[in-house]
Amino acid sequence: MSKRTFQPNNRRRARTHGFRLRMRTRAGRAILSARRRKGRSELSA
């Protein structure tokens, strides 16, 4: 039986997919603006 690969961890989640990380790069800011344009209630982790 193989182990489950998803081990939830909020700090790691925020550090890899968080808002601050998205704001750091131009591409990240593009992602946020696209999500704003689409009308997402949550922009990032």
Swiss-Prot record:
It holds the Pfam family Ribosomal_L34. GO terms for cellular component: ribonucleoprotein complex; ribosome. InterPro entries: Ribosomal_bL34, Ribosomal_bL34_CS. One of its GO terms (molecular function) is structural constituent of ribosome. The keyword Ribosomal protein applies. PANTHER family: LARGE RIBOSOMAL SUBUNIT PROTEIN BL34M (PTHR14503:SF4), MITOCHONDRIAL RIBOSOMAL PROTEIN 34 FAMILY MEMBER (PTHR14503). Belongs to the bacterial ribosomal protein bL34 family. This is Large ribosomal subunit protein bL34. The lineage of its organism: Bacteria, Bacillati, Actinomycetota, Actinomycetes, Frankiales.
